[in-house]
């Protein structure tokens, strides 16, 4: 993305933390533009962006390891504010003459910070002498400070939990202010960008819309564009952005891969053809997808297969249209960060996403990904900016691979139909209970397990259905939704009574981490 319209930029240097993008999310909540760059290219990015302030991320590495990542010396020579988070604090100290050691007591999870001194970093949130909850995740710790630094906060296992050189406006925090488990963390980051860096709020979804449209036009030129429309919020917003940018150069293609929710394909076609006048082609490729997935139980192979087939179908449809040069996808930040570090940094791969991990290396179209830098809640705000109705914007996320990854084990048409019906009943019960908007994501999973049951006077041996519901802000962390047991009982009874093939229902109470939201 071009940053010419945003002279007040914060540069976030990524050392490989899985939650680096949450730092960006918190900065954007403060209506300040920021970019994440890997430490390997931070020198170039620093020169290009000329940021007003810099934030150094956490990392799975140890500062004491030979060859561990370092921040460019140029940022410390520039006279601008710097905030180091966890590893970022440690490398800042090490680079400026302090000391960091391994082997001390580690801190993982909730901890309590004692504020030792007042500071602009704490303004309006924490006062000297008070104690506050934070979230720690570190094995190393600072043991001596560089010249000019003082301790302004401590915790039981981190005597240098918050440090500051107020004159040079360098700050370090051993905890993670970017995660929701540090209740005041977002305000602390706002203090850094507004009070300390002095950047004024000016970056909004309206501004992003203009920037994205400009970027699409610049990338596409006069080329033909097709959009991978699924009917979800992400692809729909991407389609509307692309249509605003290039108009009739765009054709949307909806692939019915046989893995969508009940009646979803028809609902999407009606909405986009009738309400938004977008050129839309519906392709029934269900036989092709389900045939390729038949008997496949490995979740990574499922995702890769689905991604490969998507591209094959789009290329075929593009040829029917006389050729297309670009493919629009609704890829988001979390999609990419969980596949491989978006920034090229050393973060650990959790699982591939069909949008990024399944693409053939020799794809014949160039990708256009206007939402690649956004989180889910930002996409919803952008959708509202583009005029999408609240009822549509508030739909729960649905994965591109669809029901295939909610059907662990081998995929068959029969199992997909059973799952589709169970999922529809579950969501219907949620809506009738008025809970839909309180839940980030809810869905049914058909387990590759059969159990004995009794219905009437007969013995049954049928599948187990797992119900999943989570609360989340951005999809990076999540907690299971705490239903009333009567609700679960009613939902289970309906599913067992109305769906042939299921005789047992269970509820998933796993948070993220350690689990992921989806089962595969």
Swiss-Prot record:
Write the Enzyme Commission number(s) for this entry: 6.3.5.2
Q: Which residues bind ATP?
A: 230-236
GO CC list? cytosol
Q: Which residues form the Glutamine amidotransferase type-1 domain?
A: 9-202
Q: Report the residue ranges that make up the GMPS ATP-PPase domain in this protein.
A: 203-395
Q: Where is the active site?
A: 86, 176, 178
This molecule's function is given as:
Catalyzes the synthesis of GMP from XMP.
Q: What is this protein called?
A: GMP synthase [glutamine-hydrolyzing]
Q: Which gene encodes it?
A: guaA
């Amino acid at each position: 993305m071009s940053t010419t319209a945003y002279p007040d930029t914060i540069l976030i240097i990524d050392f490989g933390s899985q939650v680096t993008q949450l730092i960006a999310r918190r900065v954007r909540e403060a209506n300040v533009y920021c970019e994440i760059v890997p430490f390997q290219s931070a020198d170039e990015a620093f020169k290009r962006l000329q940021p007003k302030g810099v934030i150094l991320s956490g990392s799975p590495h140890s500062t004491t390891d030979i060859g561990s990542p370092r921040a460019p010396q140029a940022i410390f020579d520039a006279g601008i504010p710097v905030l180091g988070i966890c590893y970022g604090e440690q490398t800042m100290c090490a680079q400026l003459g302090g000391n960091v050691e391994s082997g001390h007591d580690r801190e993982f999870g909730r901890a309590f910070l004692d504020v030792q001194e007042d500071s602009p970093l704490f303004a309006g949130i924490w006062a000297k002498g008070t104690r506050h909850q934070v979230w720690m995740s570190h094995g190393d710790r600072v043991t001596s400070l560089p010249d000019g630094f003082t301790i302004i906060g401590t915790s039981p296992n981190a005597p240098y939990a918050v440090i500051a050189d107020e004159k040079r406006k360098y700050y370090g925090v051993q905890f993670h202010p970017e995660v929701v488990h540090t209740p005041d963390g977002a305000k602390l980051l706002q203090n850094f960008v507004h009070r300390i860096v002095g950047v004024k709020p000016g970056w909004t979804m309206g501004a992003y819309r203009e920037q994205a449209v400009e970027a699409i036009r610049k990338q596409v030129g006069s080329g033909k564009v097709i959009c991978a429309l699924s009917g979800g919020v992400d692809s729909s917003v991407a389609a509307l952005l692309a249509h605003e940018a290039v108009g009739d150069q765009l054709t949307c293609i909806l692939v019915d891969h046989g893995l969508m929710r009940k009646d979803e394909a028809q609902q999407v076609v009606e909405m986009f053809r009738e309400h938004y006048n977008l050129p839309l082609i519906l392709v029934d490729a269900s036989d092709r997808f389900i045939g390729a997935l038949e008997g496949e139980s490995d979740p990574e192979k499922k995702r890769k297969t689905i991604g490969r087939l998507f591209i094959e179908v789009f290329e075929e449809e593009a040829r029917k249209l006389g050729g297309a040069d670009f493919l629009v996808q609704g890829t988001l930040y979390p999609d990419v960060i969980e596949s491989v570090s978006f920034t090229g940094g050393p973060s650990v791969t959790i699982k591939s996403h069909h949008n990024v991990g399944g693409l053939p290396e020799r794809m014949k179209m160039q990708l256009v990904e206007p939402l690649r830098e956004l989180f889910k809640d930002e996409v919803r705000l952008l959708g509202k900016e583009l005029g999408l109705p609240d009822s549509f914007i508030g739909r729960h996320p649905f994965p591109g691979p669809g029901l295939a990854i909610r059907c662990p084990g081998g995929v068959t048409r029969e199992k997909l139909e059973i799952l589709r019906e169970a999922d529809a009943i579950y969501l219907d019960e949620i809506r009738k209970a008025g809970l839909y908007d309180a839940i980030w994501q809810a869905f049914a999973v058909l387990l590759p397990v059969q159990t004995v049951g009794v219905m009437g006077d007969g013995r049954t041996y049928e599948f187990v259905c797992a119900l999943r519901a989570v609360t989340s802000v951005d999809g990076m962390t999540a907690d299971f939704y705490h239903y009333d047991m009567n609700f679960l009982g009613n939902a289970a009874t309906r599913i067992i009574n109305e769906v042939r093939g299921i005789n047992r229902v269970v509820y998933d109470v796993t948070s993220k981490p350690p689990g992921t939201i989806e089962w595969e």
